[in-house]
Amino acid sequence: MAKVKKICIAKNSGDKMEDVNQIEVIANKGIVNDRYFKDNNESDLQITLIESENIDYYNRISNSQMPYINFRRNVITREIELNNLVSKHFFIGEVKLLGIRLCDPCKYLQDMLKDKSLVKKLINRGGLRCEIISDGKISTNDIIKII
C-alpha cells in the first residue's frame, strides 16, 4: 500500500531540512512554514515528493547511507511510482494533489550532497513536483490514493 514514509520542510532556502510528522498545506500556496510558501505560488513549487526506493537505489549504487532528508524533497513515499502521476490527480490522506512534472535532480542538490555524478544517477528518479488542489494536513503514514 502506497504511504508517506517521511515529511521534511525548510523554513528558508538553503536551510537544513527539518523532519516533521505532519504538515499543513494550502491550495495554490504550498506548505505552511516551508521556504516556498506564498500567495499564488507556481504550481510546481508547492510540494515535492520522492520515492524512498529511489533514495535506497542511489545509496546502493553509491555505496553510501545518505539520509532521506538530505534529498530536499518534502514528502518521501513508499510503494508508489511517482513518475506515473504526471498530469494525474491523487490524494495523500485528505489532501488532493496534481502531479505537474518530474522533479529532476539539479546541480544545487549535487553540490550539497558532494556527489559529482548525482544528477546522472538520479535521472528519472528525482521525484515529482505537485500542485496542491485542496487544503488540509499530510501526516507520516498517510495513504496515497490515485483517483
What are the language-model segments listed below?
Residues 1-147:
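Metal-cofactor-dependent catalytic cores
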